[in-house]
Amino acid sequence: MVLSMAAFATADSMIKVSSNFLPGSEILTFMGIGGFSVFSMACVAKGIPLISKRILHPAVIARGASEIIATCGFLMALTLLDFSVASAILQVAPLIVTLGAAILLRETVSWRRWSAVVIGFVGVLIILNPAGINENVFEANPTGAILAIVGVTGLAGRDLATRFIPRDVPNVQAATWGFAVVIIAGGLLSLFGKPWVIPSFITMIYIITLVIFACVGYFTITAAMRIGDVSAVAPFRYTRIVFAFILSVAIFDERLTLRILIGACIIVAAGIYVWLRETKRAIPLQSNA
């Protein structure tokens, strides 16, 4: 799980680096084509058909739509915001999943978990700093702040939709078509964004690195969920923010302000608390099953 989070953080950093040379729509399209190619080969190697009626399941379609929102929103946020800020906001996704499960799925959420969700959003506000103390992210870059929130909401929607995907839909097949919708997203963005450019050799290296680490992240997180106990490995998702902060300093020469660190710690603490409460709630249910 830790390796997968390091891979995803590295992939995110390559998106931001590439955005200095290519428009976002072009990055999305290259990423989608690369990921689709890798996972298509994985499907063929495992004897899994690329096309089947299963990919038309409403949950798979909903996951694809959420993937478009998440990818477009977060990619554009990465191009506009500091890497550390965008990565910290990303950590609130599990809290939005809890919120969505309560509202859309009618799951029972205790007041303790509700409190943790609210506290987590307070952490986001501390990072964005709408009050304008020292640095107001909303005022400096309102589009980037909004896109980050849109992106993380899309990620939460993707996770919620994944819960309803039938078990007979292989993960690798779902991932293949997940990257396919990223290609579609890139095409749609190209209609409204900057014109494409011919990438240089070094830019293609960035794109290839992005695809490699994105695929490594997916394969390793899938392995972690299958090999280890989900309740045991899930908290290690938050190591992603550690790697993101290291990369933000090492690659982008960003300064980690106390405000960003405090906000990120609050979000992570709230997320881990929600996970602990959900784990305790699941134990009695398993005992009664």
Regions found by a protein language model. Give the residues of each.
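Glycine-/small-residue-enriched transmembrane alpha-helix faces in small-molecule transporters
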Residues: 1-26, 137-164, 287-289
